[in-house]
Amino acid sequence: MSNRSGYRGYIGSRPYFGERAAQHVQNLVIRDYCQRNGHPYLLSATEYAMNGCYMMLEEVFRELPRLEGIVLYSIFMLPRNRDRRRRVYDTVLSSGAVMAGALENLVIRNEQDIRVVEDIWVIKLLTETRTDKIVV
Amino acid sequence: MTQNLERSPFWTDEEWTLTQSFLDQGYVIARTESPDTLERIRTHVAKAACGHLGLDIPADAGKFLDDIAAHVDPSTLNDLRLAVINALRSADWFRPAYLALARQSLQTLVGNELAMQRGIGLSVQLPQDDSSLLPIHADVWDGDSSFEVVQWVPLVDCFGTKTMYIVPPSEDRAVQKTMHKMHDQSAEDLYNAVAEKAVFLDLKFGDILLFSQTLMHGNRINVEDTTRWSMNCRFKSIMSPYAQKKLGEFFEPITIRGATRIGLDYSLPEDFDE
């Protein structure tokens, strides 16, 4: 029998791609995802507000051997740097856990899933616009 | 945190002493301004816990809360915590009572037009329980504004690992300045970097802690024999900047003064012809 138990939520304190959701709303989305998928939900870790900081994600990695998975509020909370994202995927999958994005209802269990998420990420980066630069 | 603050002649001695202490340490601990109110809150908490657990109301609420581990374990703790929080939040007297515990100190440190966190937090930390830990953090890293103060109220005596720790301003600022170098490390690594400097705050029931949540703080596994019960709530000046914790969804204005009320409602006469 597995010693793993539950899915740790992971929410943010800063905007991602210029978008912000209140923390209790992020938690509602994660709870709903876990409920719909029959996953035991564990109270979320909250990432620090500083851009480029993933120390709370690293903290969650420390308990990966005891977790079934991590549920991010959104896959766009992952690091913007491709190599750092790759390290996140590798860390989670090599530990035997899975990772999900609750908002997008996407789960990463294997290389194929990573490709799907990476395609979305690359397109998002390419199409990223700043509304303050749009001239009408 | 702010060095060489010169005393303005507008400060009273009492205000100046409190402010200096707050700036030097990043926190102040004072006896509650309303002991009866604090006792009322603690009794309400104990009754709510008894109601949830199906127990008789205890004669000594403090001892009952200290020894709550006789009635719950980590797997049932969160249900108890939620039941007590719901009982507090549904009592319409509770939030004004919470303010009354340190009203004068808050007015000195924060201002007299206050915004108050809408949902007051409750921590219950059983002995040896590793499921209720709060990793090292500063609330400003979690979306709070640097203009806020946390009012932390113990419902039992808190000491040793039963209490929270805080990192003193000088060490805190030095570490925050170079924190980016720890970008691929965890919060636990960060704690290890400041552990020797962390101060575990000794508070008796009746003490109120006001601290700047720009300072790193958190808790560790409670290895004392009794359970920690504490409440926390953030206050800020209504007109000071907000971060991710917004007015309305997180904060509520509670003491809008008359002149501000008039100012908020007033608009200049309009529709003059040029």
Regions flagged by a language model, labelled:
Chain A
Residues 1-136:
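Short, structured surface patches at the beginning of a domain
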